[in-house]
Swiss-Prot record:
Gene Ontology MF terms: 5-alpha-androstane-3-beta,17-beta-diol dehydrogenase (NADP+) activity; androstan-3-alpha,17-beta-diol dehydrogenase (NAD+) activity; androsterone dehydrogenase [NAD(P)+] activity; chlordecone reductase activity; estradiol 17-beta-dehydrogenase [NAD(P)+] activity; testosterone 17-beta-dehydrogenase (NADP+) activity; testosterone dehydrogenase (NAD+) activity
Family that this chain belongs to: Belongs to the aldo/keto reductase family.
Keywords: Cytoplasm, Lipid metabolism, NADP, Oxidoreductase
Protein function: Cytosolic aldo-keto reductase that catalyzes the NADH and NADPH-dependent reduction of ketosteroids to hydroxysteroids. Liver specific enzyme that acts as an NAD(P)(H)-dependent 3-, 17- and 20-ketosteroid reductase on the steroid nucleus and side chain. Displays the ability to catalyze both oxidation and reduction in vitro, but most probably acts as a reductase in vivo since the oxidase activity measured in vitro is inhibited by physiological concentration of NADPH. Acts preferentially as a 3-alpha-hydroxysteroid dehydrogenase (HSD) with a subsidiary 3-beta-HSD activity.
Protein name: Aldo-keto reductase family 1 member C4
Tagged with keyword Protein transport: no
């Protein structure tokens, strides 16, 4: 089997490719560019495509996937597609319609994975970040277990092959796992994870529960000003990472991606640069030594790029706990 297509078994019997393409692009990127780069990613060897309602690009990503199926490059079952339920649809009766709306945009019959994007409910409606007259984001209170039960119904209906969560901390995961009516465990928890925030405790916890950790922002984010402090350190310029890159004759990005794969983490690589998209698939062509891994572990400083500070007062804000 081509190493590019390495997959990990999920706790529900499905399989997830260990390298994924993160499709988020800032609003200033033209939407037709999304179609081009998603096609490029599939041509380069990516089989796992990660998107979300919030990214406002599912029509374009769906078009790219369907065109690569139409030209015979891939079959639908070769592609592992992830979408995410946004926080303004956190009412049990809104969950399946939200997924159906994503499927309509994608023009696909099912998603391979549907995630709860963040554990924080916002006021229901069509505005992704609903604000009051003072410009404060409007929260909602819900029982996350009731939302999870609605996710389970999406799986039963065949609209999502697998279901999981994103940006949940240990306490929030345990709440779902301990729900007396639990039918399906989350297959994964997708969280920010990179050498500056290696999530070792959360990773150990997830492994103990047979939940896959998926790393977003694995290259330190695109530093989009809505989400990321512009003074935050640039991960890919880290001297230790750059020294390892030089040693292996690879880019710092490849070292950061390889680090995750060797820890048993599924990693998402986000790039809209054609050369880097092709380069990121080379992550299967080399290995880091145990000494290299230790050096990378030592870079951890529990530094989070995506803090979502405008939601810090939310009762379900996930990042105040240690992990």
């Amino acid at each position: 089997m081509d190493p590019k297509y390495q997959r990990v078994a999920l706790n529900d019997g499905h399989f997830m490719p260990v390298l994924g393409f993160g499709s988020y692009a800032p609003p200033e990127v033209p939407r037709n560019r999304v179609v081009e780069v998603t096609k490029l990613a599939i041509e380069a060897g990516f089989r796992h495509i990660d998107s979300a309602y919030l990214y406002n690009n599912e029509e374009q990503v769906g078009l790219a996937i369907r065109s690569k199926i139409a030209d015979g490059s891939v079959k639908r079952e070769d592609i592992f597609y992830t979408s995410k339920l946004w926080c303004t649809f956190f009412r049990p009766q809104l969950v399946q319609p939200a997924l159906e709306s994503s499927l309509k945009k994608l023009q696909l019959d099912y998603v391979d994975l549907y995630l709860i994007h963040f554990p924080m409910a916002l006021k229901p409606g069509e505005t992704p970040l609903p604000k009051d007259e003072n410009g404060k984001v409007m929260f909602d209170t819900v029982d996350l277990c009731a939302i999870w039960e609605a996710m389970e119904k999406c799986k039963d209906a065949g609209l999502a092959k697998s279901i999981g969560v994103s940006n949940f901390n240990r306490r929030q995961l345990e709440m779902i796992l301990n729900n007396p009516g639990l039918k399906y465990k989350p297959v994964c928890n997708q969280v920010e994870c990179h050498p500056y925030l290696n999530q070792s405790k959360l990773l150990d916890f997830c492994k103990s529960k047979d939940i896959v950790l998926v790393a977003h922002s694995a290259l330190g984010t695109q530093r989009h000003k809505l989400w990321v402090d512009q003074n935050s350190p640039a991960l890919l310029e880290d001297p230790v990472l750059c020294a390892l890159a030089k040693k292996h004759k690879r880019s710092p990005a490849l070292i950061a991606l390889r680090y995750q794969l060797q820890r048993g983490v599924v990693v998402l690589a986000k790039s809209y640069n054609e050369q880097r998209i092709r380069e990121n698939v080379q992550v299967f062509e080399f290995q880091l030594t145990s000494e290299d891994m230790k050096v990378l572990d030592d870079l951890n400083r529990n530094f989070r790029y995506v803090v979502m500070d405008f939601l810090v007062d939310h009762p379900d804000y996930p990042f105040s706990d240690e992990y």
